[in-house]
Regions:
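Conserved protein-kinase catalytic-loop segment immediately C-terminal to the catalytic Asp
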Residues: 57-61
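ATP-dependent phospho-/nucleotidyl transfer catalytic cores
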Residues: 1-50, 63-72, 84-87, 96-97, ...
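Residue immediately N-terminal to the catalytic "proton-acceptor" Asp
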Residues: 51-56
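C-terminal catalytic region of ATP-dependent kinase domains
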Residues: 62-207, 215
Length: 217
């Protein structure tokens, strides 16, 4: 990991799986997830169209900070990026069968943000607790500022010559379009995961204070 504030690389103390992460989060509030990093990783999933983001697709790097254990996400196996599901029958099935609606053909925009995130939604609800709209907006800005058309062009030069055909230009065009639509996609998913308030605690004697506002939140 690279710390931009200190301009130095930092090493993780350990790497754990999602099951162990969730167990530790239930133990105590001394265990915390770096929500900004997780939101950024999830927005990148949506940028490249990778809908296959189940719990085993993540590892968690462990860092100690002021007596707390902070977990930073380490995404892996991004094997459904830029998906293209051809065929009339498959196209119909991915619209008609709820369990298959996450399998969306990659395009400039997202057909349905809710169904695209069907698989990672439970984990998102479990891990994104403190972040508000401005936090999501900052991560969108960070991604869109650092991924330019020039960087995209350079990245695709690493494609093997055997697969560098006309489809590469199509993917690049759609990726640039998706990048321009990322704020709208982020806004839609932020509303989706905030439809319901989920109160999360630990195995300790936690105290919750719940206030009702005039807008019924």
């Amino acid at each position: 990991f690279f710390n931009k504030k200190t301009n130095k690389r930092i090493k993780s103390d350990d790497l754990i799986g999602t099951d162990d992460l969730l167990k530790n989060l239930r133990k105590s509030d001394d265990y915390q997830v770096d929500e900004d990093s997780y939101i950024r990783a999830r927005l990148f999933d949506m940028l490249i169209g990778d809908w296959d983001r189940h719990e085993d697709q993540w590892r968690w790097a462990t860092f100690k900070n002021n007596g707390k254990i902070i977990y930073k996400p380490v995404p892996r196996d991004r094997d459904q990026a830029f998906s293209k599901n051809d065929g009339l029958i498959l196209g119909f099935l991915t619209r008609a069968i709820p369990a298959l609606k996450l399998m969306q053909v990659y395009d400039e925009d997202m057909r349905n943000v809710k169904w695209f995130n069907l698989e990672p939604y439970p984990l998102d609800m479990a891990l994104i607790n403190e972040s508000v709209k401005i936090d999501w907006d900052k991560q969108v800005q960070l991604i869109t500022t650092n991924i330019s058309e020039k960087i995209i062009d350079e990245a695709f030069t690493f494609f093997p010559k055997e697969v560098s055909d006309e489809s590469v230009e199509e993917i690049k065009r759609k990726l640039i379009g998706r990048l321009q639509n990322l704020q709208t996609i982020s806004d839609q998913y932020f509303l989706e995961i905030n439809k319901y308030g989920v109160v999360k605690g630990t195995n300790k004697d936690d105290f919750f204070e719940i206030k009702r506002h005039q807008n019924k939140t």
